[in-house]
Amino acid sequence: MLSRTILFSTSFLWVRVANAAFGITTSDDSYVIDAGSANSLKFTVSRSSCDITSINYYGSELQYSGTGSHIGSGLGSADVSAVEDGDYIKVTCDTDTLTQYFVVHNGDSVIHMATYTTEEPSVGELRFIARLNSELLPNEEPFGDVSTTSGGEAIEGSDVFLVDGETRSKFYSSQRFIDDQRHCVAGDAHRVCMILNQYETSSGGPFFRDINSNNGGSYNSLYWYMNSGHVQTEDRRQGLHGPYSMYFSRSGTPSTDIDTSFFANLDIKGYVAADGRGTVSGTASGADSSFKWVVHWYNADAQYWTYTSSDGSFTSPAMKPGDYTMVYYQGEYKVAETSVSVTAGSSTSKDISGFVETGDTIFKIGDWDGTPTGFRNAENQLRMHPSDSRMSSWGPLTYTVGSSELTDFPMAAFKGVNDPVTIKFTATSAQTGAATLRIGTTLSFAGGRPQATINDYEGSAPSAPTNLNSRGVTRGAYRGLGEVYDVNIPSGTIVEGENTITISVISGSSGDEFLAPNFIFDCVELFQ
């Protein structure tokens, strides 16, 4: 003790260390968990509701005082227990259909969490929300104030705002699951990050994105959305979601490489340890090498993904045993699909090959990559509303093959706003035979789909796409089910010389301006 007193010569610093006593303090109303960390972390969990009602880190209260941090919108009531087991503390909150876990390791300023479900919450989404002190933690990372809505005026629903002349929304904080291992809120002296190691029981696949943070003024919200109805493309999965970790630091940004294998020893429902898993290894080939390649595995119970190496080789994350659909993407565009079985304790070898197949191209606008990248306003659409003054004019636009820039073609077509989209091109005599106009889309809203007219020939009206029942382009989303439409053009329709194609939005629904039926372009190609 003498040496510690000499080392920490000021009473202030000595008190910080002396108070770092790992353990649980129990009262009638709550459990206070002390992480025993050098930069002291103590948090309080309600014994009746499972809400986190206090987070004290390095002497500062980071929890918003008005409402707790919790799973969903709060459990309301739960059976809450806490146990200390060696260097670990586990808080368990049980309801009939959900179990929430908070886990602390002695000496670490980290709250590890996991959520076990047997059915989807009645609200149709599953998330953890930390409501944090916006005075001490005003900033959002990595995308900045695009999702800071404090002081704004609502311009669409209750989730898109105008702030100092800029459109903002909590949805603009999103990042693709495959790229989102960490997102944070921060201030001058504190940073809190959500570290995401496991998406296996989430829904939507590698390119799904959802709300990550939102400074709404009273508090700064730090989220992990496990699933939601926000442009959701598949059924929700049940089981163990996580582990996921809330990491507290004074200034530095934490690594995303966090070992949570100790969950195997903590009696966590649904946790599958490494020795109960298998992997898939192989080589992907055939797609355009100018794009990143992704391999994706999924079934009703789990999902996994990985980028391939530059030579196409890949090894999956450790997967639960089972039969999986295996998909190969060029960017976000599916080029191949197969199936594979995974066995615990072994690695399965499985190659996959595929490419984009069309024909002899007359023209192509954009790329078959499953995204609107390069088109007008695509660069801004993730982080602002289509009405934002920083957006370029939506048109209607005319794109002339051979002379226009890609930004002369809109990323989205809105019924009655910027449709029809016009394409002008010059054909040779050899190109006047039968042809196919292929219109790739990434997302539809309100039944919007393309109908094309080639010179005097009107293509057939396609049937309505699957309704995802969610706003998309106005909330920073571009990925849905990726419908592709082919227009079969009879011989003689295309003439030697100048030709005109118009693409209109058709739908039996209606809406105002950017909530009118619409769709987002992936690529438009004319080929024979």
Swiss-Prot record:
CDD domains assigned: RGL4_C (cd10317), RGL4_M (cd10316), RGL4_N (cd10320)
Transmembrane region(s): none
Catalysis performed (reactions): Endotype eliminative cleavage of L-alpha-rhamnopyranosyl-(1->4)-alpha-D-galactopyranosyluronic acid bonds of rhamnogalacturonan I domains in ramified hairy regions of pectin leaving L-rhamnopyranose at the reducing end and 4-deoxy-4,5-unsaturated D-galactopyranosyluronic acid at the non-reducing end
Acyltransferase found in the keyword field: no
Covalent S-S links between cysteines: C50-C93, C184-C193
Main location, first listed in the record: secreted
Subcellular localization, as worded in the UniProt entry: Secreted
GO biological process entries: cell wall organization; pectin catabolic process
Signal sequence, renumbered to the chain: 1-20
Key words, A-Z: Carbohydrate metabolism, Cell wall biogenesis/degradation, Disulfide bond, Lyase, Polysaccharide degradation, Secreted, Signal
EC number(s) stated in the UniProt entry for this protein: 4.2.2.23
Pfam family, one: CBM-like
GO cellular component: extracellular region
UniProt-recorded Gene Ontology molecular function terms: carbohydrate binding; rhamnogalacturonan endolyase activity
Family per record: Belongs to the polysaccharide lyase 4 family.
PANTHER family per the UniProt record, alphabetical: RHAMNOGALACTURONATE LYASE-RELATED (PTHR36574:SF1)
Functional description taken from the UniProt entry: Pectinolytic enzymes consist of four classes of enzymes: pectin lyase, polygalacturonase, pectin methylesterase and rhamnogalacturonase. Degrades the rhamnogalacturonan I (RG-I) backbone of pectin.
Name recorded for this polypeptide: Probable rhamnogalacturonate lyase A
Gene field: rglA
